[in-house]
């Protein structure tokens, strides 16, 4: 049977309680790192029992996955902001600002990001990056690519897949080459996407 504390806690809306646990886990991961945070630490921070934690999450891995979803949502929110700030027809500005966005995403330094970068958590890091690539590629195909195609020809097939691979490649390259030149990164994006950096096309001529 559950304790009185458990019953009181369960009276809170389920989604809110779950969000509280995820927020506590994220805060602790950022403060201490993944390996130094236990389920007990998380429940102590929220003020609930372990049995209530396990009502929402089967294990620490499950709540960590939810924390990753939070980070992905942050990155998507930043991408939405980037897209909203783009200047119509100004490809150079879009390239410069998206490179800055990618750098911020890769090099935000908190304990959890450092934990993800460790060999111990390599599989978790790959999962995180793949989630980011999927969500951002989907969003860009549905928004930015549509805007671009109104002014230029889209010269790539498999558009979603190309963006997915490009995002993975840029993130991986920046992690191993943090001093990479921004102009080189912009060139890589343009070459991969076969973008037209010149004037908008007005007909079907090459």
Give residue ranges: language-model regions.
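N-terminal intrinsically disordered/low-complexity leader segments
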Residues: 1-16, 201-206
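Helix-turn-helix
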Residues: 20, 28-62, 66
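Hydrophobic alpha-helical connector segments
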Residues: 66, 77-107, 159-163, 186, ...
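Amphipathic alpha-helical packing segments from all-alpha helical-bundle domains
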Residues: 76-77, 122-149, 153, 157-161, ...
């Amino acid at each position: 049977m559950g304790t009185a504390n458990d019953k009181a806690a369960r009276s809170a809306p389920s989604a809110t309680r779950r969000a509280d646990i995820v927020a506590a886990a994220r805060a602790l991961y950022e403060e201490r790192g993944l390996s130094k945070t236990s389920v007990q630490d998380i429940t102590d921070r929220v003020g609930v029992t372990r049995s209530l934690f396990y009502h929402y999450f089967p294990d620490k891995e499950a709540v960590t996955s939810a924390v990753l979803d939070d980070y992905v949502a942050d990155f998507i929110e930043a991408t939405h902001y980037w897209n909203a700030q783009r200047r119509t027809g100004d490809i150079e500005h879009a390239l410069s600002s998206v490179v800055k966005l990618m750098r911020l995403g890769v090099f935000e330094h908190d304990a959890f990001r450092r934990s993800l970068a460790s060999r111990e958590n390599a599989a978790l890091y790959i999962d995180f990056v793949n989630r980011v690539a999927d969500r951002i590629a989907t969003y860009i195909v549905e928004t930015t690519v549509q805007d671009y195609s109104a002014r230029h020809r889209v010269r790539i097939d498999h558009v979603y897949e190309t963006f997915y691979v490009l995002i993975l490649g840029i993130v991986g390259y920046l992690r191993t080459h943090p001093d990479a030149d921004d102009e080189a990164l912009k060139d890589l994006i343009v070459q991969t996407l076969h973008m037209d950096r010149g004037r908008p096309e007005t007909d079907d001529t090459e």
